[in-house]
């Protein structure tokens, strides 16, 4: 039931009871009967404040107080943000699936171009999702051509958020190690940089509908600050045509890897029952090409921070896609396009007759395509295949169970007699250790030596000289 409305008369009754000493001792019914005659004699102007107070009380009753969580945040607002985030994730997945499925239906999946992007940042605002960019890179990739082009630049934002210099210095020293403003390197005009990025994307995605945004892909944990960095650059644009950064849509590259792997296996006619998002994420996060030399920018190559370089990131992602799916599409990989131009092999050759097979979690590039057995080269046997090769081995085992000896004969095992003497010596030492001095002194005065324990006299007597 809806709450009862307040009346001006009851507002007057409550005020009369609070201000009149006589009314404090009366009940509600008695106060109503006493105030009824007074209320009838009041004019409309005198009743006005009480009627307006009743209306205000009705409004306050309808307005409920918002519940807060343990962090002091409005619970309804938090739930709204969670719903928006979930809807955004679903929208990103649907867009990725639509792109891959359209390419598959047109039988042109291996020639479809994808753009991988990455940002480095100096610092993040405490209360908002504003990130100050430090470096940007993008790469154009397709299965058939590999890496087709790379765009990379350092960014000088001019200044960082006030009061966050220490945080920016710590983040920089532990990651990309880029100098902070005002000593930062790279492009200083944010609007010009944003226009250059849009021009680069427009050349890649020719024939795109002008009303639709450019689609780029980045790592899952990078999606929030990549979107924020694009908005940061768009706000500095002078013409104001891309003020909100809506011209670029950022999607999840790890979900793209999962969808592409399933569709590639379907094209190849291979079962994809064992492929799920956890498997593809584990493969992507292994980052087989993390320490590949000469694929980062000059600054990070000289400062030995190529792992955090955005240019190295977008190229390593492209190598991972080629490494994971080019073999399923029967596409021959080319150094510098699908795989790094320089790589130090870190593997051993397993013969073709071995039962050791390549694991599905291993890199396809890290194992040679063919292994030919040479006659003059030594064969490396695995533990699983060594049992089968024993029949052809020249080794003849020897039976060591044919020797039989009598353990009671000292001439066959002379060391056993020495062991008995050693045991007697140990017992004698333990005896002297436990006995008091008064009992041990007569033994030494009688000329008893340790040799007597090893060679006992023919007369069987105990240690005290008594006959046994």
From Swiss-Prot:
One of its GO terms (cellular component) is perinuclear region of cytoplasm. Keywords: Cytoplasm, Developmental protein, Differentiation, DNA-binding, Meiosis, Nucleus, Oogenesis, Repressor, RNA-mediated gene silencing, Transcription, Transcription regulation. GO terms for molecular function: transcription cis-regulatory region binding. Residues 2-69 bind DNA. Coiled coil: none annotated. The keyword Hydrolase does not apply. Residues 381-393 have a biased composition (Low complexity). GO terms for biological process: germ-line stem cell population maintenance; male meiotic nuclear division; negative regulation of DNA-templated transcription; oogenesis; piRNA processing; regulation of miRNA-mediated gene silencing; regulatory ncRNA-mediated gene silencing; spermatogenesis. It comes from the Eukaryota. InterPro entries: HMG_box_dom_sf, Maelstrom, Protein_maelstrom. It is found in: Cytoplasm; Nucleus. Residues 374-393 are annotated as: Disordered. Belongs to the maelstrom family. Involved both in the piRNA and miRNA metabolic processes. As a component of the meiotic nuage, plays a central role during oogenesis by repressing transposable elements and preventing their mobilization, which is essential for the germline integrity. Repression of transposable elements is mediated via the piRNA metabolic process, which mediates the repression of transposable elements during meiosis by forming complexes composed of piRNAs and Piwi proteins and governs the repression of transposons. This is Protein maelstrom 2.
């Amino acid at each position: 039931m809806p709450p009862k409305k307040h009346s001006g008369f009851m507002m007057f009754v409550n005020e009369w009871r609070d201000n009149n000493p006589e009314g404090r001792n009366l009940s509600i019914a008695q106060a109503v009967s006493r105030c009824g005659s007074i209320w009838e004699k009041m004019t409309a102007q005198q009743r006005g404040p009480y009627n307006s107070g009743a209306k205000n009380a009705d409004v306050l009753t309808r307005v409920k107080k918002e519940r807060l969580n343990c962090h002091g945040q409005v619970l309804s607002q938090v739930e709204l943000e969670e719903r928006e985030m979930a809807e955004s994730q679903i929208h990103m997945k649907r867009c990725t699936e639509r792109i891959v499925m359209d390419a598959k239906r047109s039988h042109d999946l291996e020639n479809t171009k994808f753009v991988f992007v990455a940002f480095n940042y100096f610092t993040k605002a405490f209360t908002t999702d504003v990130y100050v960019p430090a470096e940007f890179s993008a790469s154009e990739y397709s299965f058939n051509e590999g890496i087709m082009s790379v765009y990379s630049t350092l960014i000088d934002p001019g200044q960082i958020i006030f009061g966050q210099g220490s945080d920016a210095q710590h983040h920089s020293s532990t990651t990309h190690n880029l100098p902070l403003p005002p000593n930062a390197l790279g492009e200083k005009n944010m609007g010009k940089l944003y226009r250059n990025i849009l021009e680069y994307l427009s050349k890649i995605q020719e024939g795109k509908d002008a009303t639709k945004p450019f689609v780029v892909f980045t790592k899952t944990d990078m999606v929030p600050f990549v979107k924020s960095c694009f908005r940061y650059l768009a706000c500095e644009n002078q013409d104001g045509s891309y003020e909100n950064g809506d011209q670029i849509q950022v999607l999840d590259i790890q979900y793209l890897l999962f969808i592409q792997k399933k569709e590639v296996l379907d094209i190849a006619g291979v079962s994809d029952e064992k492929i799920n998002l956890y498997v593809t994420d584990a493969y992507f996060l292994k980052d087989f090409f993390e320490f590949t030399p000469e694929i980062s920018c000059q600054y990070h190559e000289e400062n030995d921070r190529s792992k955090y370089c955005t240019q190295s990131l977008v190229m390593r992602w492209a190598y991972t896609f080629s490494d994971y799916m080019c073999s399923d599409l029967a596409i021959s990989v080319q150094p510098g396009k699908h795989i790094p131009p320089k790589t130090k092999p870190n593997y051993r050759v397993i013969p073709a007759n071995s039962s050791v097979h390549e694991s599905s979690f291993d890199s396809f590039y890290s194992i040679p395509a063919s292994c030919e057995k040479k006659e003059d080269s030594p064969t490396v046997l695995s533990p699983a295949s060594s049992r089968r090769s024993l029949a052809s081995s020249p080794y003849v085992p020897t039976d060591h169970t044919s020797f039989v000896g009598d353990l009671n004969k000292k001439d066959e095992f002379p060391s056993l007699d020495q062991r008995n003497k050693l045991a007697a010596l140990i017992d004698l030492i333990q005896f002297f250790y436990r006995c008091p001095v008064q009992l041990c002194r007569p033994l030494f005065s009688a000329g008893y030596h340790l040799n007597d324990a090893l060679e006992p006299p023919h007369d069987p007597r105990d240690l005290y000289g008594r006959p046994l």
